[in-house]
Amino acid sequence: MSDVQERLKKLGLGARTGTGKGTPRRKVKRAPARSGADDKKLQLALKKLNTQPIQAIEEVNMFKQDGNVIHFAAPKVHAAVPSNTFAIYGNGEDKELTELVPGILNQLGPDSLASLRKLAESYQNLQKEKGEDDDEIPDLVEGENFEGEPKVE
């Protein structure tokens, strides 16, 4: 009987709910609070600037100095044109220029075109280096026909 009571005490120690005197309260694990207060402050500041939402913007790309791009897919954009202020909401992703190349060519300015040229030159240099290391491809010998049945010697 006392053996059973000891086992119950061991099990009960981990699950104290705070019903008796002197027992610590159980900690409630909470998710981190959302930044709702910051969003409200930002909305008030944008309202003071008289920003208007801009519809039908599919993507926003911000080009960084190191050649990478901050890419926003389907962002919310607010603008105050008289004060030259734009606010972009959404999840931004750091991407390399090569990841966005086919669709981003019409958005490139002179600085970005220079980085694209450097990227293309480095790619060509890599291709030249790979061309020099073609040890896997044998050279063709004149007068030999490799399309027929193999000759066993």
Curated annotation (Swiss-Prot):
SMART domains: NAC (SM01407)
Chain residue ranges for the region called Disordered: 1-40, 126-153
Pfam families for this protein: NAC (PF01849)
Record's keyword terms, sorted: Cytoplasm, Nucleus, Protein transport, Repressor, Transcription, Transcription regulation, Transport
GO annotation, biological process: protein transport
Principal place of residence: cytoplasm
Biased composition range(s): Acidic residues: 132-147
Domain NAC-A/B: 36-101
Coiled-coil intervals: none
Entry GO terms, CC: cytoplasm; nucleus
Compartments where located: Cytoplasm; Nucleus
InterPro entries given in the database record: BTF3, NAC_A/B_dom_sf, Nas_poly-pep-assoc_cplx_dom
Family (UniProt): Belongs to the NAC-beta family.
Assembly notes: Part of the nascent polypeptide-associated complex (NAC), consisting of EGD2 and EGD1. NAC associates with ribosomes via EGD1.
Function: Component of the nascent polypeptide-associated complex (NAC), a dynamic component of the ribosomal exit tunnel, protecting the emerging polypeptides from interaction with other cytoplasmic proteins to ensure appropriate nascent protein targeting. The NAC complex also promotes mitochondrial protein import by enhancing productive ribosome interactions with the outer mitochondrial membrane and blocks the inappropriate interaction of ribosomes translating non-secretory nascent polypeptides with translocation sites in the membrane of the endoplasmic reticulum.
Protein name as annotated: Nascent polypeptide-associated complex subunit beta
Organism from which the protein derives: Gibberella zeae (strain ATCC MYA-4620 / CBS 123657 / FGSC 9075 / NRRL 31084 / PH-1) (Wheat head blight fungus)
Gene that specifies this protein: EGD1
